[in-house]
Amino acid sequence: MSRIPALRRQPGPPHSLEKMTDLVAVWDVALSDGVHKIEFEHGTTSGKRVVYVDGKEEIRKEWMFKLVGKETFCVGAAKTKATINIDAVSGFAYEYTLEIDGKSLKKYMENRSKTTNTWVLHLDGEDLRVVLEKDTMDVWCNGKKMETAGEFVDDGTETHFSIGSHDCYIKAVSSGKRKEGIIHTLIVDNREIPETS
């Protein structure tokens, strides 16, 4: 009788083939410090639950006999609270939903579009993502909170900062219309950058 050698698992990156067999959901979440990828593994036969944020394992639970429930963790530099809800749909089918700060991902992103402005630009051979948080006037560039200086000008305000050797500012002016409110414009080296929708 011939013997078949046992297969040994080779050490590898966190995204190994073994991981992909139980991968059930992937979400991209845009926060001020960048776009974060959240991946969720749910082994319905093994009871395994694993949450990855940007490829890094945040939660691992084995032998969870209760297949429905929730997993809560933090995302990004601001440690934003995120929860994955696991609900039974029918039989052995499951639905996975992501909540950010207690809101559905869709509702959270709709709300964020009202409270932030985002610009994507290419500068010195690098792709940059600039985010303005309207409530605090904090400015982020590729995940780093920028040092800023505010200045009042005739028609509004300017929030000045630098990206490398480039002078930048975000100009805030009234739209003159109550529903539109304040219009924010990013200027880099005296050139207006279109906002990302």
Q: Where do the model's predicted regions map?
A:
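Cysteine-centric segments in proteins
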Residues: 2-197
